[in-house]
Amino acid sequence: MELRAFCVILLITILAVSSQAAKNKKEKGKKGASDCTEWTWGSCIPNSKDCGAGTREGTCKEETRKLKCKIPCNWKKDFGADCKYKFENWGECNATTGQKVRSGTLKKALYNADCQQTVEAAKPCSLKTKSKSKGKKGKGKE
């Protein structure tokens, strides 16, 4: 009987200590919280070269913070990495310029980025014409 009472008291003590530790951990996380609601974020600056992992600096009143960010290596530098566009299909090849053109409309501006409403992208016309394959290679019906 005494062993059972000891185990119950021990269990209650362990639960009380662990809940207090969790409460302290939660309060510790709140210390860094801010009253600011109007954050102004700068553009993502890569750590090396012109794409990959980087940092973005934000300010609110007299407070400054840095966030980790990432610039995809296939982004269009003219548009900015924080501006997301929905693009149409590529147009026909222009024989005089030797390029195909397509336009995109702004879908989303991240971190209050200053983005153009519509943009145009161009790429050189391909020299080869793609032909449809007549049969599947590899695994399949034989």
From Swiss-Prot:
It comes from the Eukaryota. Disulfide bonds join C36-C60, C44-C69, C51-C73, C83-C115, C93-C125. GO terms for biological process: defense response to bacterium; nervous system development; neuromuscular junction development; positive regulation of cell division; response to bacterium. In adults, expression is highest in the brain, eye and bone, with lower expression in the heart and lung. Not expressed in the ovary. In the tailbud stage embryo, expressed in the head and tail regions as well as in the central nervous system (CNS). InterPro entries: Midkine_heparin-bd_GF (IPR000762), PTN/MK_C_dom (IPR020090), PTN/MK_C_dom_sf (IPR038130), PTN/MK_diS_sf (IPR020091), PTN/MK_N_dom (IPR020089), PTN/MK_N_dom_sf (IPR037122), PTN_MK_heparin-bd_GF_CS (IPR020092). Its main location: secreted. It is found in: Secreted. One of its GO terms (cellular component) is extracellular region. One of its GO terms (molecular function) is heparan sulfate proteoglycan binding. Residues 1-20 form the signal peptide. The keyword Signal applies. The keyword Ubl conjugation does not apply. Keywords: Antibiotic, Antimicrobial, Developmental protein, Disulfide bond, Growth factor, Heparin-binding, Mitogen, Secreted, Signal. Secreted protein that functions as a cytokine and growth factor and mediates its signal through cell-surface proteoglycan and non-proteoglycan receptors. Binds cell-surface proteoglycan receptors via their chondroitin sulfate (CS) groups. Thereby regulates many processes like inflammatory response, cell proliferation, cell adhesion, cell growth, cell survival, tissue regeneration, cell differentiation and cell migration. Inhibits mesoderm formation and promotes neural formation during development. Plays a role in development of the neuromuscular junction (NMJ). Belongs to the pleiotrophin family. PANTHER family: MIDKINE, PLEIOTROPHIN FAMILY MEMBER. This is Midkine-B. It comes from Xenopus laevis.
